[in-house]
Amino acid sequence: MSFVELHCISNYSFLKGASHPEELVRQAIAQGYEGLAITDECSVAGAVKAWRELRRLRQEAPEASAFKLIIGSEFHYEGNCFVVLAPHKKAYGELCRFITDCRRKADKGDYQFSPDALNENIKQGLLLWRPKQSDQEFIPALTKIFSGRLWLLLELSLSEEDDSERELIQTLSSAYNLPVVSSNGVKMHAPERKRLHDALTAIRFNQSVDSIKDRLAPNAENYLRPLNEIHEIYPSFTIQESLRIAAKCAFELNEIRYQYPKEVVPEGDDPSAYLRRLTYEGAHLRYPQGIPENVLATLEKELNIISELQYEYYFLTIFDIVDYAKKSQILCQGRGSAANSVVCYCLGITAVDPTRASLLFERFISKGRDEPPDIDVDFENARREEVIQYLYRRYGRERCAIAATVITYRPKSAIRDLGKALGVDLLQLESVIANYGWRYRGQDWIDEVITPQVSQDNHILTCFKELLPELLGFPRHLSQHVGGFVLSAGPLVELVPIENAAMEDRTVIQWDKDDLESLGLMKVDVLALGMLTALKKCTTYISEITGKTFSLESIPKEEDSQVYDMLQRADTVGLFQVESRAQMNMLPRLRPEKYYDLVVQVAIVRPGPIHGDMVHPYLRRRHNLEDPDDVPLPELKPILKRTFGVPIFQEQVIAIAIVGAGFTSEEAEELRRSMASWKRRGHMGKLMDKLIINLLKKGVPLEYIQRLCRQIEGFGEYGFPESHAASFALLAYHSGWLKYYYPSAFCCALLNSQPMGFYAPWQVIQDAQRHGVIVLPVDINNSYWEHRLEPHSDNTKEGALRLGFRLVKGLSEEAACSIIQHRTDEGFTSLVQVMHLPKINREDLEALASANALASLGENRYQQRWECSGFLYYYQLFSECEYINIDFEPPSRLDNIYEDHSSTGVVLNDHPLAYLREANLTPQCLTAVELLKQKAGLKTYVAGVVINRQRPKTSTGVTFVTLEDETGSINILVWKKTAIAQMDILVKARLLMVYGELDKDEEGRVAHVLAHRLTDLTPHLEELESRSRDFH
């Protein structure tokens, strides 16, 4: 018995298919099918996943070697279903272009289709048609144009509609002499998925399952049936027809041949020679004193490999993008594995000298890796769109699009959608979701969340618990990658369909980065980084202050001990990559003294080193408490020397696998890929087994191997390669240097680059004030839209930081621009002058009054707000009316705190804790400054506004909380036991009092409190809406 299923959708027909493409391929092979067509609706989004799984199975299972995967797509029109199959490469390109046309004519997530469009555009593809009725207008034209390429699709579901289905097919077959082929109309790989398919249908219609029963499939027959059942249900000639159609289909995705864009090479130039010329021109700029011999040797080695692998166009494409950005004064920097390349450094793509950081080019490109290199480039987030639109202009929308990101169901979204489908009380469900400690969930979290509190119906609870694991990880829709662009020499629409993104002027292909990598398509990552915006603004301000051009290159190359001293104190609010509570906790322990220490610092607070229990051994060896030369095998010393014998980076783990466990370069590459995708797929079993067995044979202690394996799994969660950390460490140092030497300019740049980082503007300003920055309030006569530096007698170097109108909540930028445009050198002298300005309304005026931005016009903010609320408007209109003057009492100190915070989010020169302390509402509580003067071990109380909460994925389950009082920041460590016991207070309190034990670093410069008991003081500040930065 033989059969090929020609109509099958996966879960990439979003909310319609109930099985992953991989499940469908595995099941079809297990059932003994000769082939399977993946025909998602107006899409080929699931095709590469199916192809990749088949490729894997062909290597492992002999029965999969002859299995045929056919690529196609289905389209629906007025009850008809049309399935287009691609018999060869030309037909596949035609199908991709047709899908693109259908998608581009509709909003995101939808498509426009008609039989006429099908007739006009599909000249090579094969067409299967499941008709709605026999007298439709389009039928004569369809049968004529698709003569010899058209089949009627017979799909029987063992329901009462089967008889009418047979009759319709027979009528049309006789009338137009059309062959008939059988199909199961597959929507799931096994009948057990019927309940999930019903739930997905309900989610799609935004209804409960019970309310749409008439729209649900009558049974579970739309699955990959066993062959014997297929032969019992369908006439044999319709089954044989499936084999004949499959025989016509020879196309496989590996036939796709990608070509790099060619216009980056001047006409008549050889790409290899052109790349060499640009590289050496850049090398002379990078090394003005002469190119060192080791750099010359590395350059030649890299250029030869690039030429041998024919990657010149790739490097030149990236160079072209970076060159455009630099000419447009857009700050950018390459990172990731590209930082291993001296060629990238000389071309100006990356900023880290690989010879300085001892990075390995083979991590970036090697002959053993059958894939193009991956270069990530960060651009100022405020100006990245300019770079994106440049790419569209240069290559056109047919040859340029953004890669997709598959948005999948995570716990909260799955619970919400499934709960709605099952008809549970949504308000109650939201309450459960909001109050559950997600960061502390264990393996039994489903049982902890889905309780009788969600529903009293035991049947619903059982369904909920059984369906939830199936829904988790299911694709929900396609979104755009954060910056991955695909460029091609020819029409990209003939390689993969392109559709509209949600964002205007953006287009997205239907494949994600894993799909692109599998097929060897070039992806250029055009990423946005807020810190680059801040750094660019900061250097611009310094240029204005000094009267001399200043850039990041102006920062001295020599290591600055004062900057590292600041880092060791964890004085890092606003600094790139080292401002989180977890990083602040690590800095005084690691105590970085030079650039490479900062590389380790950036990388060590990640799941890889943490899960592998490598952090404490590293710190002990770094501070000479353990022997740094003690490694399990002598041959591992060169690999681990720079990190004191402890593996910290992904590259080191891979090197250990090669040198210590005898991995081939191909196996090492597979290990690298597995680490990157383990969290999503979990395919690392065989590699781990080999690693363990071979290291044991070499005499490596089992405990060390187990830690290494945990570290590998940790990298699957999130871990930094050394090259990535090296690029980020450079930006961390740059931001630290600027903060230390130009704190006012740095603070101004951070505020003008919001939102970014861990801290809200208020916290950034409070920190700046502690560093001597003079901060002046928003003022109608002195402020601009952006925050600015203005001359001040108390700071002749940088001046004072004047807060800008952008901080005022409710004030439109248009109104602010009108104020600035019409403001004279003398400034405004009365409220009436401001009222009469164009493009400013009552809401704008009230916002300014609330923010006390009208203080220079006299009177208090309450009086001004009353006058702005409309009374003066009416008085101006009806001047004969008597003006009634109402005097408002000035706001109290606490009122001003409330008003400042609610209107701008910033309280200058005061703090809620100072008020509460003076009101004796926080007795026994030490201030941040007092805390530093105490001895470790002291049991004490502290209190503050909650600035942020962070719980990194550590083995200890610690939560870091930052409090702020009127004197500074207070670091709180909450262990898991305390966190679980007082979860509600921990996650909800905005003003927190903590009783605990004081802990300090060896030099007594950094203190934190180990929490024993938490008290919520928020009721004291009910009107103050201080928002913390939680769990980032």
Swiss-Prot record:
* Keyword list, A-Z: Cytoplasm, DNA damage, DNA repair, DNA replication, DNA-directed DNA polymerase, Nucleotidyltransferase, Transferase
Could you say which enzyme class this protein belongs to? transferase
Localization of this protein: Cytoplasm
One GO biological process this protein is involved in is: DNA repair
**Which GO cellular component term is one of those annotated?**
cytoplasm
A GO molecular function annotation here is: DNA-directed DNA polymerase activity
EC number(s) per entry: 2.7.7.7
Family per similarity comment: Belongs to the DNA polymerase type-C family. DnaE2 subfamily.
The record ties this protein, via NCBIfam families, to:
polc, PRK05672.1
Q: What is this protein called?
A: Error-prone DNA polymerase
Q: What is the lineage of its organism?
A: Bacteria, Pseudomonadati, Pseudomonadota, Gammaproteobacteria, Oceanospirillales
Q: Which gene encodes it?
A: dnaE2
